[in-house]
Design a protein with these regions (language model features):
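A long amphipathic alpha-helix within ATP-dependent nucleotide-binding catalytic cores
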Residues: 120-151
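C-terminal helix-cap and adjacent tail motif
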Residues: 170-231
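Active-site loop/lid in soluble adenylation, ligation, and acyl-transfer enzymes
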Residues: 1-100, 208-215, 219-247, 253
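A short mid-domain helix/strand-loop element embedded in enzyme catalytic domains
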Residues: 89-122
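Short, charged/polar surface micro-motifs in flexible loops or helix N-caps
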Residues: 64-66, 163-164, 172-173
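Conserved metal-phosphate-binding beta-hairpin within the catalytic cores
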Residues: 151-170
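Generic recognition of stable, solvent-exposed alpha-helical segments in well-folded globular domains
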Residues: 4, 123, 127-134, 193, ...
């Protein structure tokens, strides 16, 4: 589902930013992969190689997660000063760019725009910020009309043939906070269509938050899957089972 939702967004956003997707049609993959068709169908992409920036590009439209925690302590998020008196889950006056490091293991670490520029340069930082906020704004407007608030999300970018392109995944429940619009109310944590359900379950356990993580009960896995599939349906207008037929249709048009 994550792969298929990314494919949907890559297509939707292609007028805003180029991406690394070549095809999701396994029949068009290199010949040596044909014997793995059953395993690859619907859950893989053939992508272009890119030199990836070592930065997670986060866009926040609402105050939640690590941003909310940092705001409570400093009144800022990643060096961005915010108005006083905001509540958890409040909509921000405007979306903000809050980059983070790409950790090899453990959690990513929030950094400022200045620290980002020190790592990758002023011009690259300016362009990544511009792309991140443009993508977020377009996707958030689309999702809002379909009953989903994209509270925040993160992107990765790379360089191919001198052009900055989007890579990895795009606007999935793993990389974003998706809230149902009909139940949204600031001042508390929100119901969600993302991995927050798993986070909330893990918070009930006596666990030091170091790998390996505890096993998840089947009930938590099943409920998380339901939430992810509902997000996919609302955003794309299709069930996950429709993917194969729509891919076939796209090859004949």
């Amino acid at each position: 589902m994550l792969t298929q939702l990314s494919i949907f967004w890559f297509d939707f956003l292609k007028g805003t930013v180029a991406n690394h997707l070549i095809t999701a049609d396994v029949g068009a993959y290199p010949a040596p992969l044909s014997e793995y068709r059953e395993q690859l169908e619907g859950r893989s992409m053939l992508v272009a190689r890119a030199e990836v920036f070592p930065i997670e590009c986060v866009a926040r439209g609402y105050l939640a997660g690590s941003g909310w925690k940092e705001y409570q302590q400093t009144g800022e998020v990643c060096g961005v000063k915010l108005p006083a008196g905001l509540k958890e889950s409040d909509r921000l006056p405007e979306p903000i760019f809050t980059p983070a490091t790409k950790a090899e293991s453990g959690h990513d670490i929030n950094i400022s725009e200045r620290e980002t520029a020190d790592r990758i340069g002023e011009e690259a930082t300016r362009r990544l910020k511009e792309l991140t906020l443009a993508i977020y704004s377009r996707a958030a407007e689309y999702a809002d009309a379909r009953g989903i608030i994209i509270a925040d999300t993160k992107f990765e970018f790379g360089v191919k043939d001198g052009q900055i392109i989007m890579v990895d995944e795009a606007l999935t429940p793993d990389s974003s906070r998706f809230w149902p619009k009909e139940t949204y109310a600031p001042g508390r944590s929100q119901q969600s269509f993302d991995k927050q359900y798993v986070r909330d379950y893990l918070e009930t356990l006596d666990w030091n938050k170091q790998p390996p993580g505890p096993a998840l009960p089947d009930s938590v896995v099943a409920r998380t899957s339901e939430k992810y599939l509902e997000a996919y349906r609302l955003l794309t207008g299709h069930s996950i089972a429709d993917f194969g037929s729509r891919l076939a249709d796209s090859k004949t048009t």
